[in-house]
Each structure stands twice: as C-alpha cells, then as structure tokens.
C-alpha cells in the first residue's frame, strides 16, 4: 500500500513537471509548438497523393501517387522521360483544381508539348531564373505562400551558383552547388510540410571516376536531396515503340529507389508515346492482362467474351474507342489493390470492391507487373 502511494506521488509529480515544461514551451514558441500526437488530426491523417498519370506507377508507389507535403526526386539519363512524367503529374494536379508552378532552370520547357500532355499552360506558373540562388528563393516564396499544390524544379544540375556564373570559365568551385542545395533543403523541408505542397526535383546522372566495383552512377547536387526526398524515382528508356519503320514512342521503366510511404524497390514499365505522353490505354491493358481481367490467347485480346483485336496496338485502340471499358477496368484494378479510396476514376466515382479480381503485385526485379497475392501494396 505504501509503495503504491509513493508511485502515485511520483507519477503526479512527473505529470506536473511535464505540464510546466509544455506551458513554458508554448509561452516561448507559441501555441501548437508542442502537443500530443493524438490531439493533432493533421499529423495522423492519411497522406494526400497526386496521381502520376500512370496507374501502374501509382500502385507501385503504394499510396496512389506522389505524396503532398513531401520532396520527391526524379532522375535518369537524358531523354528518358523525366520531364514528361513531371508534366503528367502537373496535368493530373490541374484536373483536380490544383495550382502548379514550374521552375525552369534549364530554360528548355516546350509549351506546345506540355499542352499536348494535357497541361493547362494558361494557368501554369513558370519561372526561368538566372542563378541557383534565385531559383531556390523563388521556390521558397511560392511554397511559403501555401497556395501551390505542385512545384517542379527542372533541374538540379542547372541550379548554377551565382559565384560560378559571375566567375571565369576555368574557375574551380568545389562543392558549391552541394552546399547551396543542402542549405536550401534545410530551409524548405518544414515549409513544404506545413503548406502541403508536392515539390519535385528533376535531376541528371553523372559518372563517378575510378569506380571499379558497384554502380558508378550518381546524381548532381550532393547527398542532401537523397536524404530529404520521401520518394526517389529512377526513370530509364528501355526500348523504342515502332509502327512499321516509324518510331512512335518509348517503352519506359521506372524504379522506386526510395519510398518512405510504402515498400521501395518496386519497378514498372509503361509506354511513353510521342506527342501524347503516358499511354493510359497501354498501361491499363498490361495491368488488366496480369490480373486476368482481360484474356490473352496468342496474339488475341478479349474482354468479357468480346474480341478486342489481334495484337497489343489493336487492343489499345479498342480501349481508346470504348472508354466505358477503361473506366470499368480502372475501378476493378484500384479496388483489387486496395487504393480505390485514394484514386478517382474518370467519372469521378471512387473505386468499389469487385469480387473475382486479383490484386496486381509489382515485382522489384521484373520489368512488368505480375499477378500475386494482395500484400504490401
């Protein structure tokens, strides 16, 4: 009995000391600077996601797209589809009424191409800064405004420090860009989270000299971006899509190298068509075949007993001409993968449960999605 009394007294003193500490912190730094996690709904709610425009990639990311309030990095070799993927994200955000900004440090954004991908260029905010410091100051101002939903910086490699621009061509500026990025990300991270802005940094690949074993590839701008990013996507061109002798697009592979929202190291492939962007029909067709929602017999494809055509291109054209099948397949795939509530189909209806459908499991080592048990995604 005596021990219980002593314990109660000790607990009471702890609670009083904690209340005093919390009160002191709130007086010094303002109300809300410290709180119990369960008392703040904004900290425990599900992370909002913006679709990438490729359903297979949305599933691979685990939450239905790229997370808002976080930093994401998209990198890869030249002409692999990095900017196209970002423009696709921008188009998806604008469809939901989002405000989007594009910091074009490379001064290479093709407005006509962006329009073809579905971007509303009339409402797109664009900046073409002269220096890396200017680009990151503009980024910080836009993020702190709280009015931006998606902000894309293209690219980290083009964020040239002012000292380098004002110096002579042969001057050495060791680690200047890395220090610039490190300082900027320290300032930006908290503001990005508070404003619930998705900030995407496009990055380029460089080769490390003298690497005998392991991967010699690295990204520009130092290591800070790797640490601060919640999602890192490695985009690669794996082949050409031809119509006879004409090349009409690229087969693109995206690997989720880092993911703080779901299990990483997933890999997907989809078609990037010239002048069109990500082929939604081709992506849906691949997922539907994997999940046995579309039957494939030899070169023939059929859905619900109806012939779609001979060959993948014919099946894609069938889906393009019959949007009702695309809506149906999209809803079934979302429901089967447990993210129907996060992604909305083209008619604005949330995915519903469908019996007899199998979830699509995106495998890390395979180039295409495989059928499997419902698991980590």
Swiss-Prot record:
<feature type="region of interest" description="Disordered">
    <location>
        <begin position="346"/>
        <end position="377"/>
    </location>
</feature>
<feature type="binding site">
    <location>
        <begin position="76"/>
        <end position="83"/>
    </location>
    <ligand>
        <name>ATP</name>
    </ligand>
</feature>
<keyword id="KW-0547">Nucleotide-binding</keyword>
<dbReference type="GO" id="GO:0005524">
    <property type="term" value="F:ATP binding"/>
</dbReference>
<dbReference type="InterPro" id="IPR020588">
    <property type="entry name" value="RecA_ATP-bd"/>
</dbReference>
<dbReference type="GO" id="GO:0003697">
    <property type="term" value="F:single-stranded DNA binding"/>
</dbReference>
<keyword id="KW-0742">SOS response</keyword>
<dbReference type="InterPro" id="IPR049428">
    <property type="entry name" value="RecA-like_N"/>
</dbReference>
<keyword id="KW-0227">DNA damage</keyword>
<dbReference type="Pfam" id="PF00154">
    <property type="entry name" value="RecA"/>
</dbReference>
<keyword id="KW-0238">DNA-binding</keyword>
<comment type="function">
    <text>Can catalyze the hydrolysis of ATP in the presence of single-stranded DNA, the ATP-dependent uptake of single-stranded DNA by duplex DNA, and the ATP-dependent hybridization of homologous single-stranded DNAs. It interacts with LexA causing its activation and leading to its autocatalytic cleavage.</text>
</comment>
<dbReference type="InterPro" id="IPR020584">
    <property type="entry name" value="DNA_recomb/repair_RecA_CS"/>
</dbReference>
<protein>
    <recommendedName>
        <fullName>Protein RecA</fullName>
    </recommendedName>
</protein>
<dbReference type="GO" id="GO:0140664">
    <property type="term" value="F:ATP-dependent DNA damage sensor activity"/>
</dbReference>
<dbReference type="InterPro" id="IPR003593">
    <property type="entry name" value="AAA+_ATPase"/>
</dbReference>
<dbReference type="GO" id="GO:0003684">
    <property type="term" value="F:damaged DNA binding"/>
</dbReference>
<dbReference type="GO" id="GO:0016887">
    <property type="term" value="F:ATP hydrolysis activity"/>
</dbReference>
<dbReference type="InterPro" id="IPR013765">
    <property type="entry name" value="DNA_recomb/repair_RecA"/>
</dbReference>
<keyword id="KW-0234">DNA repair</keyword>
<dbReference type="GO" id="GO:0006281">
    <property type="term" value="P:DNA repair"/>
</dbReference>
<comment type="similarity">
    <text>Belongs to the RecA family.</text>
</comment>
<dbReference type="InterPro" id="IPR027417">
    <property type="entry name" value="P-loop_NTPase"/>
</dbReference>
<keyword id="KW-0963">Cytoplasm</keyword>
<dbReference type="GO" id="GO:0009432">
    <property type="term" value="P:SOS response"/>
</dbReference>
<dbReference type="GO" id="GO:0005829">
    <property type="term" value="C:cytosol"/>
</dbReference>
<dbReference type="InterPro" id="IPR023400">
    <property type="entry name" value="RecA_C_sf"/>
</dbReference>
<keyword id="KW-0233">DNA recombination</keyword>
<keyword id="KW-0067">ATP-binding</keyword>
<dbReference type="InterPro" id="IPR049261">
    <property type="entry name" value="RecA-like_C"/>
</dbReference>
<dbReference type="InterPro" id="IPR020587">
    <property type="entry name" value="RecA_monomer-monomer_interface"/>
</dbReference>
<dbReference type="Pfam" id="PF21096">
    <property type="entry name" value="RecA_C"/>
</dbReference>
<dbReference type="GO" id="GO:0006310">
    <property type="term" value="P:DNA recombination"/>
</dbReference>
